[in-house]
A protein has these predicted regions:
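Acidic, polar-rich N-terminal leader regions of halophilic archaeal proteins
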Residues: 1-196
């Protein structure tokens, strides 16, 4: 028996309660699925770093904007990507799995990974400027974001062999490798000397 979703896909994941989202995630109908959860976890990580940025030096800047503004924007972007992932999965399960849908099933996790990469960079800057007990919250946010990043790359790499466009696959794989190096560096910089 297929259990109906508590809320239709037209209701954004940003508007669902945590409990509703988790119930939907555990239910039989797909979506939401792993990619949607990955984007939501990335948004949670961004939120923790954003909260700490509010306590840190207001001058913490990343790429010409405040870390807090960048983190807020990426939090919102990740929630939009959660919705995009749910739509892609819905289309794939509905049997509309053509080349364009398969590319979207790669493009959405790539966008999640890119957003998580931005969170990692901004969160790392926040850790450098924050002090006191709130630093631990930013580091926890980075651990969550790193998990979401790695899950997004796993999804991307799992889906990559499904596309026929070799240049798309090669360019996407290269971008993923570059992101991985950048995120690893930012994470290590932020967590240097942190147990865990």
């Amino acid at each position: 028996m297929i259990t109906p979703r508590a809320l239709p896909l037209s209701v954004s994941h940003g508007d669902r309660t945590v409990g509703t989202f988790l119930t939907e995630l555990a239910a039989k109908p797909v979506p939401p699925a792993g990619g949607t959860a990955t984007a939501v976890v990335g948004a949670v990580g961004a939120s923790l770093c954003e909260m700490v940025a509010r306590h840190a030096d207001a001058a913490v800047r990343v790429d010409g904007t405040t870390a807090r503004e960048l983190l807020a924007a990426r939090r919102e972007r990740l929630l939009v990507l959660a919705d995009a992932d749910a739509a892609v999965v819905d289309a794939l399960f509905a049997g509309d799995g053509g080349e364009q849908e398969r590319k979207r099933a790669i493009g959405v996790p790539l966008a999640v990974a890119e957003a998580c990469g931005d969170v990692m960079e901004a969160g790392s800057a926040v850790v450098d400027h924050a002090d006191g007990p709130v630093v631990a919250d930013a580091v926890m946010g980075l651990f969550l974001t790193r998990g979401a990043f790695r899950a997004a790359l796993f999804t991307l790499r799992t889906n990559l062999p499904t596309v026929d466009d070799e240049s798309f696959a090669a360019e996407t794989a290269q971008r993923a490798t570059e992101l991985e190096a950048s995120v690893t560096t930012a994470f290590e910089r932020a967590t240097d000397g942190v147990d865990g």
